[in-house]
Amino acid sequence: MELGIALGLVNAYLKRCVSKGLVKVQNVPARRYAYYLTPQGFAEKSRLTVDYLTSSFSFFRQAKADCLVMFKTGSLAGFKSVVLVGRSDLAEIAVICGMESQTEIVALVDAKSTGGHFLGVPIVASFDAVEKSFDAVVVTDLEDAYGSWDLAKARFGEERVLVPRLLGVTKDLQGRAS
């Protein structure tokens, strides 16, 4: 069965599952599971796991498609370099799609971060801390997409802010997010 997602996205997803404790990367004796779950419990856990994996892969596929369209649209508008705002699974996908689309990801702005790197991209606490120039801002904030959109729009103008469709950020007739 073909999932339609790149191996890099699968690897990123597996790492995320391991870090969340959903998947263990070690050999475990087969009988050990009997101590944790009844057969009915194991069946329910399996069903929930399948549901979670299905919805997660759907998110990854939709996010990848949205990011590729968004970067293509940005490229047509002359945007060659962008800053992401909001550290999330969506930001991971945007970094991977940015490489695929030859769009430079200059930095990731995340007010809660204390620096470092995210998939090789510098993490900064504010737009003022971004050291390189950039053409546009991409909202990748899953917790407060509207807040990040409003902040970026006020600072750089609506025409320089890109938002993946799956975030559901829409504009009313006056140009405000609704």
Q: Would you name each region that the model predicts?
A:
Residues E2-L22, V28-S178:
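Hydrophobic, well-ordered beta-alpha structural blocks that scaffold small-molecule cofactor pockets
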